């Protein structure tokens, strides 16, 4: 109780009690400091709306600004390229799991042919891996990308992909294709908010929009995007919460560049005096008043120039304390990377302050971030693969006995991502060996991390050993290390006879 309350209590206990009761009630209502509207939060007004209402009026503006930074900001490109390198990298390898080795090899061979640009892309310009890289970039900048499954002639199978930007969804369409559905943002939904179709705007070759959109059934399309709220319907740029900081950094860099250019300038001013008499000489050097004319003259290396009598050259050198932008940029890049779930090293490529342990830990944390996009991408790839298998069966390219009864078995598959190179091969290979021998990892897990199929790895190893024996060379020691027949032979002993 304050001094004033004590004075009031001495005169009127009832009033003091009421003041204290109201004060405690006010404290109970406040609950959270974050919900207060005091001096600090007085201008912070926020409202709870559904995700679509929140995103609808900002989606196009945010996407346009993100694209502008995509074209003009090296910092945003650093974030996007980090995702492209680590989510797609060198691509994915298909491992068919039908249970029939001959059929698996046939499917994998045909898949490699289909992944070429002329077979998988309706435009014939991008291979499947290039399409995946573009999908990652468009998801980060635009928020998503739409793929249409086109069954066209040409190619190894009558199936190709058509990439559609989210701008091409017709937001003006209101009449549904099927009665009872609703169209919101160019996407038609049923009563359960499940997408059942997409309305796509049509353009001619010069980019002029045609009046009538076309309807694409949801089973013939795949919308690659992230969903962060149950009420979210359309996409939202993944860069929405970092583009303001990226733009601030760009403006800061431009301001520092201008300041440093000004600081690098050097000028000379001539302080003139009026001569005491008429001077003789060429008119090209002296003016009508007899003084030396310096107009149009510039400084040059090693120059020698005569000045007028009593004239004085004053140098203007605007150099000041150089702005140390390194610390500021490092903090900002760290915040930008953190906003995208990445470490500072992944975004800036600056490893000067990193040790092996810190670099390895950051790489592990970054892998968990990339795993979310890898999961989304592999779901899309699996959908494409299933369409590919169905097209192979319907076109008769591959024979699948009892296909519709055993469709799940014929479509079983795995994706093997191309491995990344080790930071320290000696340490990481030793760690893998220890994990394998102690049972912390299986041989299958070790091979999967290296982007290999464990059965194929064993087959290749057996092939090397068998070929070495045929040529009279024991390769066991080379492959497996000490304690093998090759190691004993090199030590002067006799290898065991097979």
Language model feature labels by segment:
Residues 101-104, 108, 304-423:
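Surface-exposed loop-to-helix/strand elements on domain peripheries
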Residues 105-116, 120, 134-141, 145, ...:
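A broad, structural surface signal
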Residues 1-96, 497:
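N-terminal-proximal low-complexity accessory segments that begin disordered
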Residues 222-359, 403-404, 486-487:
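Extended, charged amphipathic alpha-helical segments
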Residues 2-16, 350, 360-361, 379-498:
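C-terminal anchoring/interaction modules
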Residues 57, 64-95, 131-140, 239-259, ...:
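Short, Φ-rich (hydrophobic/aromatic) sequence segments
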Residues 199-204, 344-345, 452-459:
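Short amphipathic alpha-helical segments with coiled-coil-like heptad repeat character
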Residues 70-227:
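Structured, mid-chain assembly/scaffold modules that mediate subunit interfaces
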């Amino acid at each position: 109780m304050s001094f004033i309350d004590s004075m009031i209590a001495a005169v009127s206990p009832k009033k003091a009690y009421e003041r204290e009761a109201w004060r405690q009630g006010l404290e109970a209502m406040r609950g959270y400091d974050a919900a207060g509207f005091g001096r600090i939060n007085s201008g912070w007004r926020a409202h709870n709306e559904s995700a679509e209402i929140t995103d609808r009026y900002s989606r196009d503006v945010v996407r346009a600004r993100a694209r502008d930074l995509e074209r003009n900001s090296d910092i945003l490109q650093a974030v996007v390229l980090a995702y492209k390198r680590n989510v797609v990298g060198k691509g994915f390898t298909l491992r068919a799991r039908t249970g029939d080795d001959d059929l698996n090899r046939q499917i994998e061979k045909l898949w490699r042919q289909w992944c070429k640009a002329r077979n998988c892309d309706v435009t014939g310009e991008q291979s499947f891996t290039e399409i995946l890289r573009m999908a990652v970039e468009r998801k980060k900048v635009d928020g998503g990308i739409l793929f249409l499954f086109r069954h066209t002639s040409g190619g190894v199978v009558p199936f190709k992909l058509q990439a559609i930007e989210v701008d091409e969804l017709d937001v003006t369409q209101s009449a549904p294709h099927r009665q009872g559905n609703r169209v919101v943002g160019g996407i038609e939904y049923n009563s359960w908010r499940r997408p059942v179709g997409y309305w796509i705007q049509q353009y001619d070759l010069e980019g002029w929009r045609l009046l009538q959109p076309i309807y694409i059934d949801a089973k013939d399309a795949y919308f690659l995007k992230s969903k962060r709220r149950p009420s979210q319907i359309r996409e939202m740029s993944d860069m929405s919460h970092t583009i303001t900081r990226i733009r601030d950094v760009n403006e800061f860099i431009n301001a520092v560049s201008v300041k440093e250019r000004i600081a690098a300038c050097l000028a000379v001013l001539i302080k003139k005096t009026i001569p005491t008499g008429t001077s003789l000489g060429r008119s090209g050097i002296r003016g009508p008043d007899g003084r030396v004319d310096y107009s149009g003259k510039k400084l040059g290396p090693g120059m020698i120039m005569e000045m007028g009598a009593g004239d004085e050259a004053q140098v203007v050198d605007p150099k000041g304390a150089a702005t140390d932008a390194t610390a500021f940029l490092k903090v900002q890049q760290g915040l930008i990377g953190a906003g995208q779930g990445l470490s500072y090293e992944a975004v800036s490529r600056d490893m000067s302050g990193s040790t092996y342990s810190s670099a390895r830990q950051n790489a592990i944390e970054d892998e968990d971030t990339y795993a979310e996009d890898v999961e989304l991408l592999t779901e899309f790839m699996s959908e494409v693969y299933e369409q590919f298998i169905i097209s192979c069966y319907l076109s008769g390219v591959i024979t699948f006995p009892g296909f519709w009864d055993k469709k799940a078995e014929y479509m079983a598959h795995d994706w093997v991502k191309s491995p990344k190179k080790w930071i320290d091969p000696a340490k990481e290979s030793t760690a893998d060996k220890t994990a394998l021998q102690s049972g912390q990892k299986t041989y299958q897990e070790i091979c999967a991390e290296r982007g290999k199929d464990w059965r194929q790895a064993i087959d290749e190893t057996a092939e090397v050993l068998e070929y070495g024996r045929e040529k009279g060379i024991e390769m066991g020691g080379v492959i497996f290390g000490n304690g093998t027949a090759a190691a004993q032979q090199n030590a002067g002993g006799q290898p065991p006879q097979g």
